[in-house]
């Protein structure tokens, strides 16, 4: 089972990715993790990636596709894999197709922008333990304090409104066109496309995914 997750940052993909991995026994493939592993291993692709990153440049689509191809031949991908955060653009999706990387399901998590902003800017973190709260959906017992230690909670830089809105603009410009791309692919019988209502409670979204994936 080869799955791509689409959706804006904060649409709840991470939570459901965890569930899919455990339920179906497939690994999540993160391009960031792959790049770091390739550089560490000193493989030919890793050396190329290191040179590009050391020069402060962005790694090319060709190189990322080559890494994905190499990664999915590994034993843990025998039953499939889950891609989140890749492809980000139509040229990347085309390159994947040309490289013969077929996908069984494309799952789109649909959540309105304002709700995403609400979800993210309400997050509060206890830095030392990694505990995450939400002022509206999962508040601490005492406002602004960690339940366990009573220490101050903070807001991550990534969770500030300006940053969140910037990331949403980027998503709509670059990644949202993939929704149309994969809808067409599904009509052509090359994959199955499903839109999931990410505004529903986690358990309901999970049940919907089980229905889709079987």
From Swiss-Prot:
Any one GO biological process: AMP salvage
Matches recorded under Gene3D superfamilies? P-loop containing nucleotide triphosphate hydrolases
Ligand binding (ATP): 10-15, 123, 132-133, 200
Function text: Catalyzes the reversible transfer of the terminal phosphate group between ATP and AMP. Plays an important role in cellular energy homeostasis and in adenine nucleotide metabolism.
Catalytic activity line of the entry: AMP + ATP = 2 ADP
Q: Where is this region: NMP?
A: 30-59
Q: Where in the cell is it found?
A: Cytoplasm
Molecular function terms in GO for this entry?
adenylate kinase activity; ATP binding
The name this protein carries in UniProt is: Adenylate kinase
NCBIfam families, per this entry? Answer: adk (TIGR01351), PRK00279.1-1 (NF001379), PRK00279.1-2 (NF001380), PRK00279.1-3 (NF001381), PRK14527.1 (NF011100)
- Known EC number(s)? 2.7.4.3
Subunit notes for this chain?
A: Monomer.
Q: What is known of its domains?
A: Consists of three domains, a large central CORE domain and two small peripheral domains, NMPbind and LID, which undergo movements during catalysis. The LID domain closes over the site of phosphoryl transfer upon ATP binding. Assembling and dissambling the active center during each catalytic cycle provides an effective means to prevent ATP hydrolysis.
Could you tell me which pathway this protein works in? Purine metabolism; AMP biosynthesis via salvage pathway; AMP from ADP: step 1/1
Note the InterPro entries from the entry: Adenyl_kin_sub, Adenylat/UMP-CMP_kin, Adenylat_kinase_CS, Adenylate_kinase_lid-dom, P-loop_NTPase
* Annotated positions binding AMP: 31, 36, 57-59, 85-88, 92, 156, 167
Q: Which family does it belong to?
A: Belongs to the adenylate kinase family.
List keywords of the entry alphabetically: ATP-binding, Cytoplasm, Kinase, Nucleotide biosynthesis, Nucleotide-binding, Transferase
HAMAP family under this entry? Answer: Adenylate_kinase_Adk (MF_00235)
Entry's CDD domains? ADK
Ranges where the record places region LID: 122-159
GO CC terms in record: cytoplasm
Chief location category? cytoplasm
